Amino acid sequence: MHKYRNVDGVLIACVDFTDPEIRELIESDIPIVSIDYVFNNRLAVSSDNVKGIRDLLTYIYEQGHRKVAYIYGHSSAVTDARIKSFYKTAAELGMEVNEDYLIKGSYRDAQGAEKLTAKLLDMKERPTCIIYPDDLCAMGGRNEIRSRGLRIPEDISIAGYDGISITQQIEPQITTIYQDTRMIGRVAAENLINLIEKPKSSLIEHVVVEGNLIRGRSVRKMEA
């Protein structure tokens, strides 16, 4: 902890939140704001993962898809929120969830996503649409699909999550949820400054920043 002795506050993002050093930091008296990870005693800022998955799955459903696969990321508060939202939204839509279509993967692992996509494509009754944990994974899935001579979205539809610029520049443009990372960073920084300057009046809360659905062209409109 000596490395943080002279700092006024710490913004934590894109780390292994289970790391002992991170846990020790969280339990210290240093003002801390975490991004996309919720601790009981710390202020957290994240995108609205519940609404994001709800909007994404609802759009896919409205395009006529009923066999929807979801490759989700490693265990975390973000993943838990997304999975619960997936099940809840499916129930509200009256869409049956095939448990074989829900597969655990990892965030930002394109190669891993390729292998999991292959597993889904090899199923006797394969899904008509695959949702990936992020856009990088969607790109990996896209590679596997194209390597088999299949077309997106004519043969199979895909959707990502993040809204990174490259997925909006390729054809077909990837359907995804745009996360306003700049806004998330700004809100996190503002809250950290408040924690440092006004510790007695700063609330320990979970601040949520909404994202937006980018419809793209990677989800096919199914024929009735």
In which residue ranges do the predicted regions lie?
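Central regulatory/effector-binding core of bacterial HTH transcription factors
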Residues: 1-18
